[in-house]
């Protein structure tokens, strides 16, 4: 399975929208900067037809060092979660159905 990179996205903008390569790269960077900025200000990011990025606070919990077996605390932290939207779920399920 190949991965879609930011460079790939910029290349598609260049090919499909006729932006020059610098503009395409800047547009992709600006898109991700907006998402990062919103999340850093504790805002939810909703992309219609794609999904939602949310912030979740995780409490401190006990963990274990896999090498030594020693119990160590895993500190409380904030994590980014992604919940796919219905359209994305349907596309993935339809694609997965053609791969069997």
From Swiss-Prot:
Residues 53-72 are annotated as: Disordered. It holds the Pfam family Bac_DNA_binding. GO terms for cellular component: cytosol. CDD domains: IHF_A (cd13835). GO terms for molecular function: DNA binding; structural constituent of chromatin. GO terms for biological process: DNA recombination; positive regulation of metabolic process; regulation of DNA-templated transcription; regulation of translation. Belongs to the bacterial histone-like protein family. Heterodimer of an alpha and a beta chain. PANTHER family: DNA-BINDING PROTEIN HU, INTEGRATION HOST FACTOR SUBUNIT ALPHA. This protein is one of the two subunits of integration host factor, a specific DNA-binding protein that functions in genetic recombination as well as in transcriptional and translational control. This is Integration host factor subunit alpha. The lineage of its organism: Bacteria, Pseudomonadati, Pseudomonadota, Gammaproteobacteria, Pseudomonadales. The gene is ihfA.
């Amino acid at each position: 399975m190949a991965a879609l990179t930011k460079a790939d996205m910029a290349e598609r903008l260049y090919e499909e929208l006729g932006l020059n390569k610098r503009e395409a790269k800047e547009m992709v960077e600006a898109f991700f900067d907006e998402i990062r900025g919103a999340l850093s200000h504790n805002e939810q990011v909703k992309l219609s037809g794609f999904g939602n990025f949310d912030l979740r606070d995780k409490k401190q919990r006990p963990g274990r060092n896999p090498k030594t077996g020693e119990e160590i605390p895993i500190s409380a932290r904030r994590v980014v979660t992604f919940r796919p939207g219905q359209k994305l779920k349907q596309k993935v399920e339809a694609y997965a159905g053609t791969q069997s």
